[in-house]
Swiss-Prot record:
Record-linked Pfam families: Ribosomal_L19
Keyword Ubl conjugation: no
A GO molecular-function descriptor: structural constituent of ribosome
UniProt organism field: Koribacter versatilis (strain Ellin345)
Keywords: Ribonucleoprotein, Ribosomal protein
Cellular component aspect of the GO annotation: cytosolic large ribosomal subunit
Purpose of the protein: This protein is located at the 30S-50S ribosomal subunit interface and may play a role in the structure and function of the aminoacyl-tRNA binding site.
Biological process terms in GO annotation: translation
tRNA-binding recorded as keyword: no
Name assigned to this protein: Large ribosomal subunit protein bL19
């Protein structure tokens, strides 16, 4: 058995199946476990999915505007710190990566609602 097969087998055990399916353009709320000292709490990060990556270690990028400043956060899909993901809204987009939203402000950054 080669090294890559061993790695694939280990990552297959850690794969999460409880998360909903979502696509770039969807507005999601990601509940993340935050550990402060000996306490643990949940923190929500709500924004638009601007990209997903697949492969052995899939991840997705969520962008939001906080106090007029753009904030992006990259989440590993199979991470244990993600408690749950809620899909709030779906948008109709024609791109897999929505990096062009970084340059847009205000109403120009809106996405069309999916039917």
């Amino acid at each position: 058995m080669s090294n890559s097969q061993v790695i694939e087998k280990l990552l297959a055990k850690a794969k999460r199946t409880d998360l909903p399916s979502f696509a770039p353009g969807d507005t999601v709320r990601v509940h993340v476990k935050i550990k402060e000292g000996d306490k643990e709490r949940l923190q929500a990060f709500e924004g638009v999915v601007i990209g997903k990556s697949n492969g052995l270690q899939p991840s997705f990028t969520v962008r939001k505007i906080s106090f007029g400043q753009g904030v992006e956060r990259i989440f590993p899909t199979n991470s244990k710190v993600i408690d749950k993901i809620e899909v709030l809204r779906s948008a109709k987009v024609r791109r897999a990566k929505l990096y062009y939203l970084r340059a847009l402000r205000g109403k120009a950054a809106r996405l069309k609602e999916a039917e």
